[in-house]
Structure formats: C-alpha cells, structure tokens
Amino acid sequence: MSSDDRHLGSSCGSFIKTEPSSPSSGIDALSHHSPSGSSDASGGFGLALGTHANGLDSPPMFAGAGLGGTPCRKSYEDCASGIMEDSAIKCEYMLNAIPKRLCLVCGDIASGYHYGVASCEACKAFFKRTIQGNIEYSCPATNECEITKRRRKSCQACRFMKCLKVGMLKEGVRLDRVRGGRQKYKRRLDSESSPYLSLQISPPAKKPLTKIVSYLLVAEPDKLYAMPPPGMPEGDIKALTTLCDLADRELVVIIGWAKHIPGFSSLSLGDQMSLLQSAWMEILILGIVYRSLPYDDKLVYAEDYIMDEEHSRLAGLLELYRAILQLVRRYKKLKVEKEEFVTLKALALANSDSMYIEDLEAVQKLQDLLHEALQDYELSQRHEEPWRTGKLLLTLPLLRQTAAKAVQHFYSVKLQGKVPMHKLFLEMLEAKV
C-alpha cells in the first residue's frame, strides 16, 4: 500500500462541479449547481462535515432515491463557536435543494462520478474504451461539433475532446490489461485556453500522478464570475464592491473545497476552522495568480473581471496589484503546472501560521502528506529539475506577505464603511486582523 493510499480514506468526498449563478440568488443558487450564492443566506462560516468515500469512479450519487425524485433536504446541527476571541464565529450547516446532476459531457442524467467528473454511463464507457483501446479519432468537420445526448455519437473526436475539457482523469482508467499504452492525445485548445489551464492526456513516458494530486485535481472548483453591479457607476466603489462580493462567494467555495483535501476532514473542527481563518486570503490570491499566468501584466480576479495597472490605480488597488503581479511573474518564471498549483494551494492551507491549533501532530501529518505528494510529483514528472520542489515551496512566504497586504487593505476599506460586505467575508477579515 502506498503512502497516498494510507492517508486517503473517507476524507476524499465527492465534488460537484458548478456553473456560475447570480450572487443575489443566495441559498437558491445551490439549485442551479452554483457555489456563487453569498454567505448571508447560509449564516456565515460553515464547514460541511458529512463526507462519504468516493473514488474516481464512484457509486451512484443518490443512494436510496431516484434521480428524478424530490430534492432531498438535510440540516446540520450548529457546531462549536469560533476559536478566535475577536471573532466568535458560529457554524451553521444546510444542504438545500439538491438537484439531479447532469453529465458534463453530453447533458444526459449523470449516474455518478466517473474518472473525476459527473457523467452518464454512456460517456463513462466511451472514455474508458478510448483510453484502453488506444484509439485516435479524427473530426470530419472543424473540431467544434456540439456534443449533446442526441448527438454524442455523431463525432467521436469531439466527444473525446469534450471528455478531456470537462476534466475526465486518465489516471482513473485501468491500463494493465491493454498492451502498449495510450498515444499522446492533445485536445484542441480553445481561444481562452493555455498551457497553464489545460488538462491533457500525457505522453506514455510520464508516470501516473499520485493519488493525492489526482484527488486535488478533482476537487478543484469550477470558475466563478464577478458579475459587477450593472447600475453602479464606474469607479473605486464599484470595483471594491465587486471584489468583496466575489471574495465572499469564493470563501463559500473554499470551505467546501478544503474538506476534499485528503486528511483535512479528519482534523478537529477547531483546527479546521483555525487553518481556514488563517490561510483563506493566501488561497484566494493563489487562485488569482494562477488565473493570471497566461496574461501579461493583468490580474484575473474572475473570468469576467480582469484588471490592468490603470484599472487598479482607479480602484485604489495599485499597491496590491503590484504585489500580486510580483507573485504572478515568479510563478510564470517557474512555469507552474496545474498539478503543482493545486498541491501548493492545499499546502498553503495546511502550513498556515495559526496560533490556535489544538492538535499539532495531526496538522503536521497533513503537512507531511502534502509535502510528500508534491515531492513525489516532481520526482516522477520533473526529475530533470531536482531542486524544483524547494523552489516552489519558497514561493509560499511571499504569498503570505502578499495576503497580509490584501487583508490590511480590505480591512481599511471595511473601516471606511463605504463598501457593503457580506457576513462571511467580514467574519474572516476580522479573524485575520
């Protein structure tokens, strides 16, 4: 049994990819597969504690209920109040109006999570046949065929590219009964894609990813959208209002993401809260940095909200813009890959500087697990760069410094009282000051 296998256990719950939704929809946003509802409807800082074991190819998501049945509702009891004296944060839990899930490839009803993605049996089988059979397809048209339930058989090439695009993991397919291996198959990159954003079938020379890294890839949340208030005049207030609302919605997503980090849910509730309260801004900034890698001197706060130097100056964010851009340039120089990014993000959470950890040994084990996962990845995939792990880890202090600047800036915005802030963002901001 590998070191990854020993630590995975039941902490790797399922993760449902989501679509953007209006922040005004509150808790109803969940019924549209969206994590984008603000925190006000859910009562502030919450950790969804109930997890179940789920691998890359999981059982059906709704045991004991038909996919077309009535949405199930489940309430959770209030849990312990916050650790920090300056921020008595109460946890409230609610899982509201869970809809039936759709296959991310063709839109049919999903039967479960297959190879890391909610998908139907037909697309699951198609992806498996393609990988195990070492099959290459050719599109008779322009590689842009629409893949729907009715038309999914019309073009195998575009269907396979769609499987890759939504994130199906090659590591989930068993190859031990097939001679040879897979041919290198690169999906066509769309206009917004880049080497930083694509997840491709790798050449046979590359070794399989460790399970930890594979699970972190699966746990990655879907894109969020800023959706700036349309009626508000352009200026610093609109920019700050947009970013504060976006940060609040991202925090809701981060809390759900954290419990899918192998080993995190086994920590005590108090330690989970302490780590999140300490590292949330680092995680937010690391996301901005990674999204900004394909761009020159621009920060991608969200897919629909990109700020250059002039925009940042008008918003009063020039100092923060320059600090984050310094990180972007550093990661760009390292040519950081998505597998490294997701592991560094988990490490930023586990390596937080919280003074309120109850079980230091348990947190240390989580840190060791993630350090080992990063090191194993570098040894197997980037063995020609023996010092790469150290170089990546040395970016974390600068990330922490940048996060501290961001916290101070938004706390000063809070004190001015000119920009509305949602409950969760306020609580987490006060916990850091």
Curated annotation (Swiss-Prot):
Residue ranges, annotated region (Disordered): 1-38
Matching SMART domains: HOLI, ZnF_C4
Keywords, sorted A to Z: Acetylation, Chromosome, Cytoplasm, Deafness, Disease variant, DNA-binding, Metal-binding, Non-syndromic deafness, Nucleus, Receptor, Transcription, Transcription regulation, Zinc, Zinc-finger
Designated gene of the protein: ESRRB
Family (UniProt): Belongs to the nuclear hormone receptor family. NR3 subfamily.
Post-translational modification, as annotated: Acetylated by PCAF/KAT2 (in vitro).
GO biological process assignments: cell dedifferentiation; cell population proliferation; inner ear development; morula formation; negative regulation of stem cell differentiation; photoreceptor cell maintenance; positive regulation of DNA-templated transcription; positive regulation of stem cell population maintenance
UniProt-annotated stretches for the region Essential for ESRRB transcriptional activity and interaction with NCOA3: 203-433
InterPro entries, per database record: Est_rcpt/est-rel_rcp (IPR024178), NHR-like_dom_sf (IPR035500), Nucl_hrmn_rcpt_lig-bd (IPR000536), Nuclear_hormone_rcpt_NR3 (IPR050200), Nuclear_hrmn_rcpt (IPR001723), Oest-rel_rcp (IPR027289), Znf_hrmn_rcpt (IPR001628), Znf_NHR/GATA (IPR013088)
GO terms for cellular component: chromatin; condensed chromosome; cytoplasm; cytosol; nucleoplasm; nucleus
Localization: Nucleus; Cytoplasm; Chromosome
Site (Important for stabilizing DNA-binding): Y185
Identification of the protein by name: Steroid hormone receptor ERR2
Zinc finger regions, NR C4-type: 103-123, 139-163
Top-level lineage group: Eukaryota
Compositional bias segments (type: Low complexity): 28-38
Molecular functions (GO terms): cis-regulatory region sequence-specific DNA binding; DNA-binding transcription activator activity, RNA polymerase II-specific; DNA-binding transcription factor activity; DNA-binding transcription factor activity, RNA polymerase II-specific; estrogen response element binding; nuclear receptor activity; nuclear steroid receptor activity; RNA polymerase II cis-regulatory region sequence-specific DNA binding
